[in-house]
Regions:
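N-terminal secretory signal peptides that target proteins for export/translocation
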Residues: 1-4
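Solvent-exposed beta-strand/loop surfaces, strongest in extracytoplasmic domains of secreted
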Residues: 6-11, 25-141, 159, 167-170
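C-terminal segment of classical bacterial N-terminal signal peptides
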Residues: 17-25
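Repeat-blade elements of multi-bladed beta-propeller folds
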Residues: 62, 138-146, 177-207, 221-249, ...
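Short beta-strand-to-coil "C-cap" segments at the C-terminal boundary of structured domains/repeats
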Residues: 133, 497-501
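Short, tryptophan-glycine- and acidic/Ser/Thr-enriched carbohydrate-recognition patches
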Residues: 144-156
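A short beta-strand motif characteristic of beta-propeller blades
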Residues: 164-176, 216-222, 257-263, 301-307, ...
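Short loop/turn segments that connect beta-strands within beta-propeller blades
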Residues: 211-214, 252-255, 296-300, 336-340, ...
């Protein structure tokens, strides 16, 4: 700025200059310090099991690590297969834990995502695949289910694309192959395959729980008892083992821990597989006449006993309508689930040598040691027909599948002519059916998948050893195949083969 003064008269003009500096902007402040760098992290995810049945509990652990210390914060577990969030858990010493039974059936892709913090960057684990078998895909007793109908409604492998997943040889005492006898029919449940193996050097058997994915032994336990008989059933994440002397023992299916043991009273020869159904284990025993027992799955207490002519060899067949057993001389029984006798189909003879009955629709298919197999009405016990089969028949809602003279035959249950026949006279196993295919084994060691509709061969594979048929009268170990949790499992001597996709 300049000021000017003009001279008046003789005065002199003076110029005054004033320089003002511009003011600093009001928004200018000192810059804040830079934040510390955010450390990188890595997240990994593990599971207590990667092959489970639907509704089974699985524990996941997400571990978050960093070179800069132990991360804090939380991790979210997501099923990337459908985008569902299974939960969020806080890190404790770098690990977040999730326990869930909410996995849907199928192969699920689980992802753990760490959200990060002020000091640690977010990160996600690689997807972890968990195979979840649909409920109902378990094989829980002889011939798959409590009706013994050989039918697996869910969990069937693709019969046209079967390959051998594993083959294991199972031994006698202490896992040694010394004394190894025959392998029993398998029970398939909760990501495991359960079998018993006869010990030919001593009395008793061994119970094995195998990883269904690999065939590796998860746990095993010796089952004492007279002779080499034992048999299994499964329900409620519990495996039930019965020995020849009538000792019924419950084990945790996941750990092998013994939960309880009950000595069944009054009889001394137990030669039929148990059947577990809706919280109760049903057992047939012989010696002094015979009994059918109902035992609580929760505590092993005997709930009731039903008297029969002879209690050997016939595994109880059970559904909502009652408990059915079939003995020699066509001595067949139906008990209510509460233990009262509903009917007794009898003939003029008595004797031992029963065989496992099969339930399908409104009928009971009964077999004795030396009798013509008979078809009885479930409601009344009256005879409605006969059938021919060397083994327990299987059903799929369309056909009855039998083994007749070493061939697999599809029978129209209404009595029409046979629909088809397959085989060369060497087929020996009780058939099982699932996913539109009938599976059967040959004494040559071959296993076949046959179209249920046409009888045409879909697939054939080798079990690796001789396959035996079920000798319900003479053998200590009852053998048979099973389908469950996406596997076809086949005993062959002292080995067990599993086929899948």
């Amino acid at each position: 700025m300049r000021w000017y003064v003009r001279a008046l008269g003789g005065c002199v003009a003076v110029a005054v200059g004033l320089l003002l500096s511009p003011a600093s902007p009001a928004s200018a402040h000192p810059k804040p310090p830079k934040p510390p760098p955010v450390a990188t992290t890595s997240t990994t995810l593990t599971a207590s099991a990667t092959s489970v049945a639907q509704d089974s509990w699985v524990t996941f652990k997400a571990q978050v690590t960093s070179n800069a210390g132990t991360p804090a914060g939380s991790v979210t577990l997501t099923d990337a297969s459908d985008g569902s969030i299974l939960g969020t858990s806080a890190l404790v010493s770098g690990t977040a834990t999730f326990t869930t039974a909410a996995l849907a059936p199928g192969t699920r892709q689980l992802v753990a995502s760490y959200g990060g913090s002020t000091s640690f960057a977010p990160s996600s684990a690689a997807a972890l695949a968990v195979s979840v078998a649909q409920t109902g895909s378990d094989a829980v007793t002889y011939q798959i289910d409590p009706s013994h109908d050989g039918r697996q409604a869910f969990g069937a492998p693709d019969a046209s694309a079967l390959t051998q997943k594993w083959n294991v040889t199972l031994g006698g005492t202490g896992g040694s192959l010394a004394g190894a006898g025959d392998v029993s029919y398998p029970v398939i449940a909760g990501g495991r395959v359960f079998v018993t193996v006869e010990n030919t050097q001593t009395y008793g058997t061994n119970l094995f729980a195998l990883d269904a994915s690999t065939g590796a032994t998860d746990w095993s336990v010796g089952l004492a008892g007279t002779y080499g008989f034992s048999a299994l059933a499964y329900d409620g994440q519990t495996i039930f083992a019965l020995n020849y002397d009538g000792l019924l023992t419950a084990f945790s299916a996941s750990t092998g821990q013994e939960l309880w043991a009950t000595q069944l009273p009054d009889q001394w020869a137990f030669t039929a597989p148990p059947t577990a159904y809706d919280g109760v284990v049903y057992v047939s025993g012989a010696g002094y006449g015979g009994y059918v027992y109902a035992v609580s799955e929760a505590d092993g207490l005997v709930q009731w006993e039903g008297t029969v002519e002879n209690g050997d060899k016939s595994s109880p067949a059970v559904d909502d309508s009652g408990v059915y057993v079939s003995y020699a001389c066509q001595q067949d029984y139906r008990f209510s689930l509460s233990g009262s006798l509903v009917w007794h189909h009898t003939t003029s003879c008595e004797g031992g040598g029963g065989s496992t009955a099969v339930l399908d629709g409104g009928n009971v298919y009964g077999r004795g040691a030396h009798d013509t197999p008979v078809i009885l009405s479930k409601s009344s016990g009256t005879t409605v027909g006969t059938f021919a089969s060397q083994t327990a028949p299987a059903f799929d809602g369309n056909n009855m599948y039998t083994i007749d003279n070493g061939n697999l035959v599809a029978v129209d249950p209404s009595g029409s002519p046979d629909r088809w026949s397959f085989g060369d006279g060497t087929l020996v196993t009780a058939p099982v059916v699932s996913g539109g295919a009938v599976f059967v084994g040959s004494s040559t060691g071959m296993v076949y998948a046959v179209s249920a509709a046409t009888g045409q061969q879909i697939w054939a594979g080798a079990a690796g050893s001789v396959i035996m048929g079920p000798d319900e009268q003479n053998a200590d170990v009852l053998v048979g195949m099973a389908v469950g949790d996406g596997l076809l499992v086949v005993p062959a001597g002292n080995a067990l083969a599993a086929f899948g996709n």
